[in-house]
């Protein structure tokens, strides 16, 4: 089950937390395996590699992995319009292989091949296609791509370059035998727009499938729009069982989110069982090596962030101010203890490495 969300920007912390909380509610309610996001508006080059897209989902009990793409040629601020990403969780993790991004480094799309058998591979692609309007401002997606095209002497418009590059990449994937699920914010009508016509002209065997759930009247997928600009394309081998468009009220961004059910038979192949790895703790007190490594990381982080010195300072200020403590002191204490908790969680995740080599399943047990 795949959840598709047009986030409309997540660079601000307050807005991001609200949108991610809404996304987590949808993930838990509908038991989503893979989440695809467009227009994250986040420059991942300005943060540490550990602060990835998966780190935004703090309430997940089990491991999650992510892939994200942004414009790698401009790294001025954390807010950067555009970008795409995906988050994989639960039983999908064991089938998700090495992801890839836009080969021009513009963050227009990212993809994740999913397979159990390499001869039966399905590639999930999430893409964001800029609109045809020449948006004002120097940091818009349109202006970013125009600057790239001028720098490399590429003629045409950003939309033409996107259509040419993505369809060429899809052809290469199809030629290598991969099945394709393309999830797209086209910024135009997904059936009558230029991108869909380009698919027909190039002879690529992709068809739009979300329109089959529209009913008698086509919906508008942007809150201020009048036509469906968000959709999905698939190769003929993919079996789409259900498509559900959510209302704007339940969607995290300003576009309607939608959920797609795809058969395991077409995605992974015949006779594949639903296997989910159990949760394994890295910190085990009976293993002295993991305990020593945990203590080493905690002490190192405590020294780096001067935790003990700050605790002594807070203790002295508490004695001086008395009870009840002023608001600024309460906020300082809460922040300090929250940081101590984060350090312990970080140390628990890093104290022992768990290897998960690929291994065959045992033969079927004969009763």
Regions picked out by a protein language model, each given a short descriptive name:
Residues 1-54, 76-79, 186, 289-290, ...:
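N-terminal, active-site-proximal structural segment of metallo-dependent hydrolase catalytic domains
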Residues 41-132, 246-252:
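Structured beta-strand-rich core segments of catalytic domains in phosphoester-bond hydrolases
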Residues 13-16, 74-77, 156, 196, ...:
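Conserved, non-catalytic sequence blocks in retroelement Pol enzymes and Pol-derived host proteins
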Residues 18-31, 116-118, 157-181:
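Short, basic/hydrophobic alpha-helical segments
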Residues 4-15, 135, 140-155:
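Acidic/histidine-rich helix-loop elements
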Residues 16-23, 50, 144, 153-168, ...:
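Well-ordered, non-membrane alpha-helical segments in soluble/globular domains
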Residues 114-150, 237-367:
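Surface polyanion/phosphate-binding segment centered on an Asp-His-Pro turn
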Residues 33, 87, 91-108, 172-180, ...:
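Metal-dependent phosphoester-hydrolase catalytic domains
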């Amino acid at each position: 089950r795949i959840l598709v969300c047009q986030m409309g920007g997540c660079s601000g912390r307050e807005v991001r937390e609200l949108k991610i909380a809404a996304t987590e509610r949808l993930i838990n309610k509908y038991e989503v395996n893979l989440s695809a996001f467009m227009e994250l508006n986040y420059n991942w080059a300005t943060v540490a590699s550990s602060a990835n897209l998966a780190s935004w989902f703090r309430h997940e009990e089990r491991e999650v992995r992510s892939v994200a793409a942004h414009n790698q040629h401009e790294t001025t601020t954390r807010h950067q319009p555009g970008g795409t990403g995906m988050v994989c969780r639960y039983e999908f993790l064991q089938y998700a292989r090495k992801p890839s991004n836009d080969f021009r480094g513009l963050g227009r799309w990212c993809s994740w091949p999913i397979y159990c058998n390499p001869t039966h591979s399905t590639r999930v692609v999430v893409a964001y296609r800029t609109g045809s309007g020449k948006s004002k401002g120097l940091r818009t997606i349109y202006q970013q791509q125009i600057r790239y095209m001028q720098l490399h002497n590429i003629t045409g418009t950003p939309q033409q370059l996107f259509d040419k590059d993505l369809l060429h990449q899809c052809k290469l994937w199809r030629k290598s035998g991969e099945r394709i699920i393309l999830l797209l914010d086209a910024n135009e009508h997904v059936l009558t727009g230029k991108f869909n016509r380009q698919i027909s002209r190039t002879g690529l065997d992709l068809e739009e499938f979300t329109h089959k759930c529209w009913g008698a009247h086509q919906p508008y997928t942007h809150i201020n729009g009048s036509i469906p600009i968000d959709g999905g394309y698939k190769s003929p081998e993919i079996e789409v069982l259900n498509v559900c468009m959510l209302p704007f009220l339940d969607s995290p961004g300003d576009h309607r989110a939608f959920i797609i059910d795809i058969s395991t038979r077409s995605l992974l192949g015949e006779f594949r069982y639903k296997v989910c790895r159990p949760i394994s703790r890295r910190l085990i007190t009976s293993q002295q090596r993991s305990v020593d490594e945990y203590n080493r990381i905690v002490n190192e982080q405590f020294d780096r962030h001067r935790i003990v010195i700050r605790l002594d300072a807070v203790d002295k200020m508490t004695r001086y101010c008395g009870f009840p403590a002023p608001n600024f002191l309460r906020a300082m204490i809460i922040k300090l203890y929250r940081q101590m908790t984060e350090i312990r969680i970080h140390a628990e995740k890093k104290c022992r490495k768990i290897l998960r080599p690929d291994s065959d399943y045992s033969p079927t047990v004969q009763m």
